[in-house]
């Protein structure tokens, strides 16, 4: 079934019916027009919801898997070998204290927090702010329970 078969467009809304299950789909990043390396962290979170095993191979920036250990704190079953991560989906993620290491990792941790059971605290959100202006405000408008708080252990490094 195609995504367009799951969408209904009404006067003031788009209604999307989710699938009963998400099938795992392995991807390889590539330069345009291939799968963008900037989306592989988010794809990893989607694979956490899938029913089965899939791989993400980053052929552009092979060192962009710093989010995997943090997702592991939330219960993601995955392992990294070189420029590839294997994700074993189907495990419910749990809220945890996690720390973002870069822009892409930070948004993947926010997405993971949105689907996790319990509360997730994402630290070092200054990474997130570099690419997503007032994301918590926008997500709140969509009904997501999210807010910005300051924790000393998550604060940006002080300049000398």
Per-range role (PLM):
Residues 4-160:
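Short, structured segments at the rim of ligand-binding sites
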């Amino acid at each position: 079934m195609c995504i367009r078969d799951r969408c209904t467009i009404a006067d003031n809304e788009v209604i999307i019916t989710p699938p009963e299950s998400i099938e795992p789909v392995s991807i390889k990043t590539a330069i345009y027009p291939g799968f963008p390396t900037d989306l592989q962290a988010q794809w990893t979170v989607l694979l956490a919801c899938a029913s089965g095993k899939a791989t993400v191979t980053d052929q552009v920036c092979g060192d962009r898997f710093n989010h995997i250990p943090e997702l592991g704190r939330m219960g993601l079953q995955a392992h990294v070998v070189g420029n590839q991560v294997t994700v074993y989906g189907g495990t419910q993620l749990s809220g945890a204290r996690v720390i973002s290491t870069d822009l892409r990792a930070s948004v993947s941790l926010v997405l993971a927090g949105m689907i996790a059971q319990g509360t997730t605290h994402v630290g070092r959100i200054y990474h997130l702010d570099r690419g997503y202006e007032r994301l918590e405000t926008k997500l709140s408008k969509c009904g997501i329970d999210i807010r910005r708080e300051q924790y000393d252990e998550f604060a940006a490094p002080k300049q000398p």
